[in-house]
Amino acid sequence: VIPYFGWARQDRKDKPRVSIGAKLVADLLSVAGIDRLITMDLHADQIQGFFNIPVDHLYASAVFLPYIESLKLDDLVIATPDVGGSKRASTFSKYLGVPLVLCNKTREKANVVATMQIIGDVKDKNVVLVDDIVDTAGTITKAANIMMEAGAKSVRAIASHCVMSDPASFRVQESGLTEMVFTDSI
């Protein structure tokens, strides 16, 4: 059982002569003798294909969706802080029957967001940002701040995996986030 598969962001080659870390770890686990893996909210679905054993891929939406419903927020929209999370956020918006808002970001380098634009309307809305991993919190806090500047009533964030590397705590405290909710996968 590996709730947080920490190598999941290394799911493809992004530079020459770099290994695909998620595939390497999948091979190591198989050689070590595991015959089944249970994990949660993989960063990329294709990681399941790196294994030669059955992978049970669980989703935190089973916990998060009832929580969001319990908030009874009016004018709710679901948002994703990056286009890569659009499939995940779309599942939430369809289930809840509310609009979906996307953020389009560009990065200068790893863990550094250069620019971000909102695609959709957040003015006078209660926004719930849905993500899989919060590491340095740069993306999620930038998205929250941009949405507050665009007139959102409130911005909450939910994420499956809470890494919170420095300077994440500072960024969250200084951001426009009303609330952050995580699982205890780490």
Task: List each language-model region with its residue ranges.
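PRPP-associated nucleotide enzymes
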Residues: 1-186
